[in-house]
Amino acid sequence: DKTAYELVGIARDKDRPKITEYIDKLFDGFTELKGDRLGSEDGSILGGIAFFHGMPVTVIGHRKGHDTEENRELHFGMASPEGYRKAMRLAKEAEKFNRPIICFVDTPGAYPGLDAELHGQPGAIAESLAMFSSLTVPVISIVTGEGGSGGALALSIADEIWMLENAVYSILSPEGFAAILWKDAKRAAEASELMRMTSREILKTGIIDGVLPEGEDMYDEMDRMLVSELGKLTRLDKRTLVSRRYEKYRSIGNF
């Protein structure tokens, strides 16, 4: 078995599939939609309309680059407030046209730059949490790599949340956790064990609903799960969908 910190390394691997690969493998006719309609565009959030087995859906997710230069342009998948506002715009559009939403989460966290703070990063994330919680269309979120902090949570308020088996999901990086707790980022491996950030540990807490295996059959299994769960969720009326989502999040955690 791999250690938690080994899984962190796998989740961060530059060769892991990106959102563009998932779109190519799972959907047909993807059309990208850009801009937050407030004058800005953030490429670290990719979103648009596609068909899933003939069903119109909205796809939204974090976008990482395939090389260092592209990653710098995309802030390594760390979205700005403009990116989250774009995601919210697309989600509201999906609600208007009764399209299910499928989110792909892969980010170290929200972009921490000065401009992001000045443009309202905390508020944008909070607005996203509130809006996704009240959407009247099905939402499925899949953590495919790094699920870091509020940057990941902003696209993780969903009716179903799944993780790939080698993905991680946490309040912050193990290096940051170690630096805060022990003033020593070199103890990241130790911190990652305490944080219970692996897919199997997160599943035990009830935060996620399933773990998807990786390997040759990964896309086929993901397709089967999406077909099954969308079939169930699209049969629910709007009131039941929102109420069910509310109860789901009220029941998470130990008190």
State the predicted function of each range:
Residues A4-E6, K18-L26, G83-L90, C103, ...:
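General structural feature for long, well-ordered alpha-helical segments within catalytic domains
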Residues K18, H66-E69, Y111-G113:
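Short active-site-adjacent helix-start/loop capping segments
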Residues E32, E93-K96, A110, S134:
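Alpha-helix capping at helix-to-loop junctions
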